[in-house]
A protein has these predicted regions:
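Rossmann-like dinucleotide-binding domain for NAD(H)/NADP(H)
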Residues: 219, 225-320
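Redox-cofactor binding/interface segments in oxidoreductases and associated redox assembly factors
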Residues: 6, 47-48, 66, 195-196, ...
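Short, conserved loop/helix-junction motifs that constitute active-site signature segments
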Residues: 54-60, 77-82, 213-217, 239-243, ...
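Phosphate-binding beta-alpha-beta segment of Rossmann-like dinucleotide-binding domains, i.e.
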Residues: 82-137, 163
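Glycine-rich adenosine-cofactor-binding loop
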Residues: 90, 131-155
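Residues at the starts of beta-strands that form the adenosine-phosphate
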Residues: 3, 26, 137, 159-160
Length: 320
């Protein structure tokens, strides 16, 4: 029998599914906020999120099914116990986060935020022309699961989509062109909407700097749902204050949480949310995380290949 420790929030319906996978699995549940080293010593499988420094206490770990898509903190040498398989939840978050992104863009494009300000004043006032997604050019930087799902939705609304990713793969039919990061600044020049879904690795640190913002149109909308560290916050503030870009939608920031006295809060052309585009805010995403875990638990029991195995050199999944 294998001991499975679930260290993530789950619904009762999720527990029913997990508890009935196989009599070979002894499944227990504990919050990752209170888990102790002694809880981990004889654990064979972990499902959820565990602070990287706690993994050293997992003396017989065979499978770590992370509930996140991002793997920051876990790929350094020695973090994952030797012999353990490490898989992430890539593929779970695209639906929820892409809808958030489209919603944020429409909010600023259609001036919903400004009309909401007028509402308490009972002010019936036409705020003039607005922009449209139809006919726009969208650049998606970080064209993985989340970026692709967002691109599909933007294409459906009539935007021409360009993608940038770490390594070139087969281009989806709906995408105008696919590039690597080497072409970032050139691609920025034509975009009306720039969306970044980049993870927080050293190679993505402050990719969006002064030079990047200077390459953008002054009418561009910038949206970040990846990691705040991919953006030079000072450069972003300068671009917004000088109207070098039209607006920003930020679900992630650097630093995070964003300090209460940070000037981004008071900028009228910025929409800020506290890292809520993913997580368990949309049940369908929560369900998808559990579905990935269930499939991999079954694969483990049958000796089959695990889905979403993380390449420890890149931090990305090697398979689907």
């Amino acid at each position: 029998m294998y001991k499975v420790l679930v260290v993530m929030d789950v619904l009762e319906e999720h527990k029913v599914i997990l508890d009935n996978i196989s009599p070979e699995l002894n499944v227990s549940y504990i919050s990752n906020k209170v888990v102790k080293p002694e809880d981990l010593a004889d654990t064979d499988i972990i499902v959820g999120y565990l602070a990287p420094d706690l993994l050293k206490h997992c003396k017989q770990l065979k499978l770590f099914q992370l509930s996140n898509a991002g793997t920051e903190g876990f790929t350094a040498e020695g973090v994952i116990p030797e012999g353990a398989v490490f898989a992430n939840a890539s593929g779970a978050y695209g639906l929820a986060m892409s809808e958030y992104m489209v919603g944020g863009i429409l909010c600023l494009m259609k001036k919903f935020d400004q009309y909401k300000v007028n509402q308490p004043k009972h002010e019936w006032k036409d705020l003039g022309p607005v922009n449209a997604i139809y006919g726009s050019k969208t650049l998606v930087v970080g064209f993985g699961d989340i970026g692709n799902e967002f691109g599909v939705r933007m294409n459906a609304l009539g935007s021409k989509v360009t993608g940038i990713r770490k390594h070139l793969t087969n281009k989806p039919d709906y995408v105008e062109s696919l590039h690597t990061m080497d072409d970032l600044h050139e691609c920025l020049k034509d975009a009306d909407i720039v969306a970044t879904c980049l993870p927080g690795y050293s190679e993505t640190l402050k990719v969006f700097n002064k030079e990047a913002f200077d390459s953008m149109k002054d009418s561009v909308l910038f949206i970040n749902v990846g990691r705040g560290t991919a953006v030079d916050t000072d450069a972003l503030c300068d671009a917004l204050e000088s109207s070098k870009i039209a607006g920003a939608i930020l679900d992630v920031t650097d630093p995070e949480p964003l300090p209460a006295d940070h000037k981004l809060w008071d900028m009228p052309n910025v929409l800020i949310t506290p890292h809520v585009s993913g997580g368990y805010h949309v049940k369908a995403a929560h369900d998808r995380i559990i579905e990935i875990a269930v499939r991999n638990l079954n694969h483990f029991l049958k000796g089959e290949a695990i889905e979403n195995i993380v390449n420890m050199s890149t931090g990305y999944r090697d398979n689907k």
